[in-house]
Every structure is written in C-alpha cells, then in structure tokens.
Amino acid sequence: FVGAALKVLANVLPPVISWIKQ
C-alpha cells in the first residue's frame, strides 16, 4: 500500500508544484 501511495504522489506532486510556482 505504501509503495502504491508513493507512486501516486510521485505522479501527482510535480504538476502541483509547478502550478504553485507559477
């Protein structure tokens, strides 16, 4: 479960971070 959660976070975080930095 932890591995899947980290995989999802790895896929979701970059767009969110780039959006916040705009």
Swiss-Prot record:
Keyword Secreted appears in the UniProt entry: yes
User: Where does it localize?
Assistant: Secreted
* GO cellular component annotations of the record: extracellular region
* Alphabetized GO MF terms: protein kinase inhibitor activity
User: Sorted alphabetically, which InterPro entries does this protein's record hold?
Assistant: Melittin/Api_allergen
> What keyword terms does UniProt attach to this protein?
Amidation, Amphibian defense peptide, Secreted
Q: Name one GO biological process term.
A: defense response
- Which tissue types show expression of this protein? Expressed by the skin glands.
**What is the superkingdom listed in this entry's lineage?**
Eukaryota
Provide the protein name.
Answer: Melittin-related peptide FQ-22-1
Annotated source species? Rana arvalis (Moor frog)
